Amino acid sequence: LNPGDEFSFNKIVGERTPEKGYQSAIVYQTGGKSEAEAGGGVCQVASTIYTACLYADLKVTERAPHMFTVTYVQLGMDATIYWGSLDYKFVNSTDHPMRIDASVSGGYVHIKLVGTAPKDKGYDHIVLRHEVVATVQPKMEIDGDKTIITDAGTALDENGNTVNIVVDKDGNKYIKGDMVQYSYVGKTVMAYRDYV
């Protein structure tokens, strides 16, 4: 990646399809749904590149967080991508060419940005700090007949899929139509601020 060149995840990786060997895994979709789709989970790679870019102090030109928190990086360190709508992009904002080395081992994605570190930055290294600035409880809505509360929260089923939890007027909780015998407290969503 030459100085001033922009990296686009979607342009480099291309569309994720079964024909290209991408397996099906869960993706977050518009409206809060999560469904299996070819290339699901590839956001983990985009998020790892994003983190590397932050530590390298490169200029990020396009990045969007997921609609839900993810577990594979700290809050605010994720980068979601979706073919045709969401991309992750950054610019080589150094004065020297750089390359991206990517590998997988032991179930982990490793990203190295290899290049010449600028000498005029005035610091030796970068520390990322996270601060929770607010928490928001799960949204609840009562349907027309006031018997079902929807969007009471989400949970992961035995396959790792996100499922909605429905609570009836008596406080009974259901997941995928089956009554569950345990209490569930919905995950809170946290607003955060990142510092570089």
Regions found by a protein language model. Give the residues of each.
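Well-ordered beta-sheet/strand-loop patches within structured domains
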Residues: 1-196
